[in-house]
């Protein structure tokens, strides 16, 4: 478990010790098992923060979990940062991952804005559950 300690610690952007992040984790990390709590956090981040790929702030402040929570929205990277932070606040080891992905569900407006359907630097979260890293992408709201 000592090897997982870095994946439980706060960082400048994964500000898991921030009061708002801790409160969100306490409110939403419900369930009998760690997996149940992780799924509850995933759903809360995915559906509780509106996906908005048109407001991108790459500053340190703009990339903080606490900032995305305060704004109630974010694009894939801040939403992944939030899930990583609230998981850590709930005691679930978590880390960020990035990949270039082709999004066949993107809107015409987004494809025109990006001039492609490839999402470069798509952010996701990896959660340590049941002895392995599990990928979770909370970007796109269920609705």
Question: PLM features: residue spans?
Answer:
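Hydrophobic/aromatic-rich core segments of domains that either
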Residues: 43, 78-143
């Amino acid at each position: 478990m000592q090897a997982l300690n870095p994946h439980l610690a706060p960082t400048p952007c994964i500000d898991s010790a921030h009061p708002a992040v801790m409160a969100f984790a306490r409110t939403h990390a419900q369930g009998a098992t760690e997996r149940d709590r992780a799924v509850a956090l995933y759903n809360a981040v995915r559906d509780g923060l509106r996906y908005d790929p048109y407001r991108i702030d790459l500053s340190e402040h703009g990339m903080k979990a606490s900032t995305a929570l305060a704004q109630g929205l974010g694009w894939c990277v801040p939403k992944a940062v939030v899930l990583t932070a609230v998981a850590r606040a709930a005691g679930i080891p978590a880390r960020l991952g990035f990949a270039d992905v082709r999004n066949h569900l993107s809107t015409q407006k987004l494809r025109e804005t990006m001039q492609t359907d490839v999402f470069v630097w798509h952010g996701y979260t990896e959660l340590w559950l049941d002895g392995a890293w599990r990928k979770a992408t909370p970007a796109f709201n269920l609705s």
